[in-house]
């Protein structure tokens, strides 16, 4: 069975709820999921995971200078090299994500090979578009194994 590590940084709980919804979706597709806060995530959590989800709420001005919050940035610096994992970035936001994903990737530079999927939502649940995107990602992962 494939497995996923879902890491998250949440300010008011919205990103945590989004992470839980992603985990439920993965579990419904027979992928075991573990959700771990960036405050609690350690190197051993990455072992055995086929895919790693990195989630953070969008910090910054309403429509400019979007970026991950400092706690997530510090976590990214300590993340081990995980070039053998499929990577998904996700964020919750109020108005726009702007440069959020670009900034997240910058902080993971040298730790990951590529980002396979980027998910975003204004709500603490996956949208129908998110579900279709994740479904396509899972299909591509299963075809390559």
Regions found by a protein language model. Name each.
Residues 1-26:
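N-terminal beta1-alpha1 ligand-phosphate binding loop
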Residues 17, 25-29, 34-36, 48-145:
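FMN-binding flavodoxin-like domain, especially the glycine-rich phosphate-binding loop
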Residues 38-41:
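Conserved SAM/SAH-binding loop
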């Amino acid at each position: 069975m494939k497995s996923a590590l879902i890491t998250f940084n949440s300010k008011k709980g919205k990103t945590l709820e989004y992470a839980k919804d992603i985990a439920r979706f993965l579990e419904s597709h027979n992928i075991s999921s573990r959700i771990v806060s960036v405050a609690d995530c350690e190197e051993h959590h990455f072992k055995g995971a086929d895919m790693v989800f990195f989630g953070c709420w969008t910090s910054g001005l309403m429509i400019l200078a979007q970026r991950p919050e400092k706690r997530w940035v510090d976590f990214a610096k300590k993340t081990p090299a995980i070039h053998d994992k499929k990577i998904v970035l996700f964020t919750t936001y109020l108005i726009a994500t702007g440069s959020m994903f670009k900034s997240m990737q910058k902080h993971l530079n040298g730790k990951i090979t590529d980002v396979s999927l980027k998910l975003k939502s204004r709500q603490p649940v996956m949208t129908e578009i998110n579900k279709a995107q994740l479904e396509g990602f899972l299909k591509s992962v299963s075809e390559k194994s």
